[in-house]
Amino acid sequence: EVSINKKNAEDFVLWKPSSEEEPSWPSPWGKGRPGWHLECSVMSKKYLGDKFDIHGGGRDLIFPHHENEIAQSCCANDTEVFSNYWVHNGFITLSNEKMAKSQGNILKISDFKNNVNGQALRLALISAQYRQPLDWNDKLLEESQKTIDKWYKSYVVLDKPKLISDDDLYPLYDDLNTPKYIANLHKLYEKSQSGNLEDK
């Protein structure tokens, strides 16, 4: 059902009236406040300019939020482009359920800081490509810790270490394909176990 305040079903709020409890400012349309999409466009313009390089957010914000930001920002700034690159991350789920405060199933970094290796935590978090969902569980963290331990046990200080090749780094240039990059690191580890210092 289309709101009586809309001329078209696709219209979105630019300015809305405020209740007594909400912040408000005077305007030609009466006392009110910016709509959700406008808040973000204004902050972006203030701190980043009419156009900027990278805009990010969760996958759930692609539509309508980011689409509406683009529409109003390009119109207001008379630009063809609002952001050069859009980076939308997948959700981290817990037992295949979206984390939500209302469900009481959220994890905080502070939950891990005293008993989890930060490198293992980072490795676990990048085990899925950033656009994809990641189901968090104890096994994922345990496997990541085992991998970090394994890599460190084979660590050798070399006078002239070899740089990681462009081929091995390539997945990072391919939309930050971290799972493929980690697979390449595993292959490099296996190669380094050959006993040949040239491969380390």
Predicted features along the sequence, with ranges:
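Alpha-helical recognition segments enriched in aromatics with Gly/Pro capping
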Residues: 1-146, 152-159
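Helix-loop elements that line ligand-binding/catalytic pockets
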Residues: 133-136, 140-198
